[in-house]
């Protein structure tokens, strides 16, 4: 990441999928980073031995400092993607994708337009 270290602590995987946490806890960072880690962990071309993958957020501006705490924490425990990593994350992803493609759910933009400040698709919603 090249922006400011905005990482916040979360208590559960469910918080990642709660839209109200995107701005306050930057759960989008968790979503993206854990998703990448799961893809690396599950890809036999990248991880033949199925070694655990530890997703981190590395902030360039903090690279020299001793205080570069890059670990993603859920309930104060570092996230490690392996055989024992909970299926709750996969279920959350599945639910999001299912909702996107559910034709019975009409599209409605978020009521919290602060989330849209830098979105390149803003003009399609408002």
Question: What is the predicted role of each segment?
Answer:
Residues 1-126:
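RecB-family 4Fe-4S metal-dependent nuclease core
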């Amino acid at each position: 990441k090249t922006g400011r270290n905005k990482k916040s602590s979360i208590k559960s995987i469910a918080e990642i999928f709660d839209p109200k946490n995107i701005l306050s806890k930057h759960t989008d960072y968790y979503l993206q980073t854990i998703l990448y880690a799961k893809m690396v962990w599950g890809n036999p071309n990248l991880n033949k031995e199925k070694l655990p993958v530890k997703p981190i957020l590395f902030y360039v501006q903090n690279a020299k400092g001793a205080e570069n705490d890059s670990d993603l924490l859920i309930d104060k425990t570092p996230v490690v993607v392996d055989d024992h990593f909970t299926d709750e994350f996969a279920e959350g992803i599945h639910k999001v994708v299912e909702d996107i493609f559910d034709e019975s759910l009409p599209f409605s933009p978020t009521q919290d337009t602060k989330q849209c400040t830098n979105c390149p698709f803003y003009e399609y919603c408002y």
